A protein has these predicted regions:
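Conserved alpha/beta enzyme-core scaffold
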Residues: 1-194
Length: 194
């Protein structure tokens, strides 16, 4: 979903044409599957999904004693953008603790960040609870405005006009290709989005 711009047209078309496989799930079920991988167990139970029509389309999910059993979800690579990384290689995600779960569950975690903080954020009491340890981070790269056209809380807001521009361009494969050539594939010496 592209905020106010609606659904992501290229993803939607690829799913409709069967070019990518989409498996329906709930956020709690996905989080539980990631927690199973994080803990190194093959599956984990979750309550509250029983009775959902999603279960019929998920042969990998099992119901046992009124609990849904979901298999571990272990991503090959997690990619995300954070506000801060530090000199020790730790990454601050604040209250976005689901990112810590994803990092713990993944085989590799690659993070771009807005600003480098001196020292070790795990030693700063006010920041430590929102930090993912370098143990779970494979690599970081400084990328100011790296979330653009999306936003970073407390740093910059989403660029809704550009997201709308992308959504219009991405309605066709040709428009999407032109967008990629202009905004993604063309090297820039500097970048200063609105």
């Amino acid at each position: 979903v592209l905020t106010e711009a609606g659904l992501a047209p290229r993803f939607t078309e690829a799913a409709e044409k069967g070019e990518i496989k989409v498996r329906d799930a709930t956020c709690p079920a996905i989080h539980t599957a990631l927690q199973a991988a994080e803990k190194g167990v093959p599956y984990m139970p979750i309550g509250g999904v029983i009775g959902s029509d999603l279960i019929a389309g998920r042969p990998d999910w099992k119901v046992v004693d009124d609990l849904l059993i979901v298999p571990a979800l272990r991503p090959d690579v997690a990619l995300f953008h954070a506000r801060w990384a530090d000199e020790a290689g730790n990454v601050w995600v604040g209250r976005r603790r689901e990112l810590a779960t994803v990092a713990h569950a993944s085989r590799q975690t690659l993070v771009t960040y807005e600003e480098l903080k001196k020292g070790d954020m795990l030693e700063e009491e006010l920041l430590a609870t929102g930090v993912i340890s370098t143990v779970y981070i494979s690599a970081t790269a400084h990328a100011p405005k790296g979330a653009w056209p999306l936003g970073v809380a407390g740093v910059y807001a989403p660029d809704d006009m550009h997201l709308s521009q992308y959504a219009r361009a991405a309605k066709t494969r040709e428009g999407f290709q032109r967008y990629l050539e202009e905004w993604v594939l063309t090297p820039r010496k500097s970048f200063s989005p609105a």
